[in-house]
Regions:
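Conserved P-loop
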Residues: 67-145, 195
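Walker B motif beta-strand of ABC-family P-loop ATPases
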Residues: 149
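Interdomain "pre-motor" coupling segment immediately N-terminal to P-loop NTPase/helicase cores
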Residues: 2-53
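Short hinge/gating elements
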Residues: 7-14, 87-90, 156, 191-193
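Extended interfacial segments that mediate partner engagement and assembly in macromolecular machines
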Residues: 38-82, 86-90
Length: 217
């Protein structure tokens, strides 16, 4: 009840000034405590998200972008998270993909969804470390599957070797139809095979799982 200890005196003074009943005073105290808990919860999941910087949809200039605003507005309802659907943001550098990904992630934290943000390079490094320490399944279950939304930024800038490509498949497969993914890439889908160790079958399997139940922007 930390909120009560911090705010009870100010609320008591306010209630005395307003001449409210003792019952109303208790109600204001409880409302304040609940709001403090909600705020603390939002701050906790925001910190855990790991955003490199904070971006919001209000900061995005739709007039200077080819992005469909109506489509983003629909995504901002966060129904895609509840439905374990994916969002794939494609485009060249500087088109606002990362901004939109972080903005949607920020909205999710305000609803107290557990989310994680990674660049593709950082995520693959962590997957490799976990695999080398024989704790890949634990990592996938706790960090990856344990988040309602996983954001993978900058996929396609670095080519993956065979081990990395297989680890990426395991990650995508782990979340398939169970958790939402937002992924940004500078490459159209026909170029993904070049990044995924030129493995045609693996690329097809990854794209099949990502594109199924997805919103492509």
């Amino acid at each position: 009840l930390s909120g009560l200890f911090r705010g009870y005196q100010a609320i008591a003074d306010e209630c005395a000034k307003d001449g409210v009943s003792y019952t109303d005073y208790l109600k204001r105290l409880l409302d304040y405590e609940l709001e403090c808990r909600a705020h603390n919860g939002r701050q906790t999941v925001l910190k855990m998200a790991g955003f490199p910087t904070l971006k919001t949809l209000e900061m995005f200039d739709f007039k200077e972008s080819a992005v469909n605003k109506a489509q983003i507005t629909e995504l901002a309802t966060l129904r895609f998270i509840a439905n374990a659907e994916n969002v794939i943001l494609l485009g060249s550098s500087g088109t606002g993909k990362t901004h939109l990904a972080i903005s949607l992630g920020y909205l999710a934290t305000q609803q107290r969804y557990r989310i994680r943000f990674f660049t593709a390079a950082d995520l693959l490094l962590q997957l490799e470390v976990a695999s080398s320490q024989n704790r890949l399944e634990q990592y996938l279950s706790k960090i990856i599957a344990g988040s309602r939304l996983l954001i993978i930024d900058e996929f396609g800038y670095v080519k993956l070797n065979e081990t990395q490509a297989n680890l990426f498949f395991q990650l995508v497969n782990k979340r398939y139809e169970t958790g939402a993914i937002i992924i940004t890439s500078n490459l159209i889908f026909t170029k993904w095979q070049e990044v995924l160790n030129n493995d045609e079958a693996l690329t097809a399997a990854i794209l099949d799982r990502l594109i199924h139940h997805s919103h492509i922007i």
